Design a protein with these regions (language model features):
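Hydrophobic anchor residue at the start of the ABC signature
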Residues: 134
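Catalytic Walker B motif of ABC-type/P-loop ATPase nucleotide-binding domains
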Residues: 145-148
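H-loop/switch region of ABC-family ATPase nucleotide-binding domains
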Residues: 186-187
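Helix-to-loop junction immediately C-terminal to a conserved catalytic motif
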Residues: 50
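Q-loop/switch helix immediately C-terminal to the Walker
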Residues: 80-92
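Conserved ABC ATPase signature
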Residues: 120-124, 128
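Conserved ABC ATPase "signature" region
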Residues: 98-116
Length: 213
């Protein structure tokens, strides 16, 4: 999914913009890291790309929220079993009903939660909830994957496993022949180097650098 932002501004206060972007293009197959200090606008940009909030002015071209998935810093899970949580995600993404159970089981195994399939999602530990949220996003096979500090709650053993899944989704083109677009935030510069081909730095709601890695 190719997305273009033009003359975009976002902010609740009409006299102050939290985010201001003159022009930005997100290309498919080019994993992009958003870096910068807390409060620089990284999460706001992800939320705009997901269609959760609307800009005060400007345009976002090419965005289709139905083909987008996001992993938040704080997992948003329902009071149902882990397996049903993933089956619901697949159903909402329009996947065949007869394949929902198998897909859920596959992704639970991939994120190491197969033994917790029947456990209520909201009773999992913070790291387990984050892994379930990652499985939920990847199961949807999105054309745009947005990750907000996706491994912040994970330990040193689980982080590389999740990074491998992120890299794996990049190698699988969609029906249109394009690989998924990946945009993520991270304060871990080593993770940025492992996952990203492009780094965008934000400060005080504006892009101050944009470079290929």
């Amino acid at each position: 999914m190719r997305i273009e932002l033009i003359d975009l501004e976002y902010g609740v206060d009409p006299d102050h913009s939290i985010l201001r972007i003159e022009h930005l293009v997100i290309e498919p197959g080019q994993p992009t890291a958003l870096v910068g200090p807390n409060g620089s606008g990284k999460t706001t940009l992800l939320r705009l790309l997901h269609g959760l909030i609307r800009p005060r002015s400007g345009r976002i071209l090419g965005l289709d929220s139905a083909r987008t998935a996001m992993v938040f810093q704080q997992s948003r899970l329902l009071r149902m079993s882990c397996r049903h949580q993933l089956m619901l995600a697949g159903w909402l993404a329009g996947q065949p009903v007869g394949q929902l159970g198998a897909a859920a089981d596959l992704w639970l195994k991939r994120v190491g939660l197969h033994e917790a399939a029947g456990q209520r999602a909201t009773t999992l530990s913070g790291g387990q909830q984050q892994r379930l949220a990652i499985a939920q996003a990847l199961l949807r096979q999105p054309e745009l994957l947005l990750l907000d500090e996706p491994t912040a709650s994970l330990d040193a053993q689980q982080t590389p496993l999740m990074e491998t899944l992120f890299q794996g989704c990049q190698s699988k083109p969609h029906a249109n022949g394009e690989p998924p677009s990946l945009v993520f935030t991270s304060h871990d510069q080593h993770q940025v180097k492992r996952l990203a081909r492009r780094e965008i730095r934000l400060e005080q709601g504006q892009i101050v650098s944009d470079q290929l890695l």
